[in-house]
Amino acid sequence: MTNQRESILRYAAENFGTTPEYLWKSTPDAAVLRHRENGKWYGLLTNIPAEKLGLPSGRTVHILNVKCSPLETGSLLQKTGIFPAYHMNKTHWVTVLLDGTLPEPELFWLLEESYSLSNGNQFS
């Protein structure tokens, strides 16, 4: 487990009361972060082949998928380490590479935004 992954899980537990859910036997490290109240996802931590993000192949990378406003997607994708969402709606989600490219405060801000947007009132 990467340090950033551990930090995100700790942040989600401390700030949102979230316990990660491990839903798939085929990907036992994939952790879903969801609201207790409405069951909606606000984060997905998993490992994927680097080539799924257009990176050089031959390695596995740790990622976080977070929800974002469609108005912010374009500017977020200009940042190094943020990609069109892997396996999610690319209008409402982005994928963040957990390799230290983005500092933890920025990761936590993205997680907070995702938590807020997925509360059931917007962009469902």
Short names for language-model regions:
Residues M1-S124:
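Charge-dense, helix-prone N-terminal extensions
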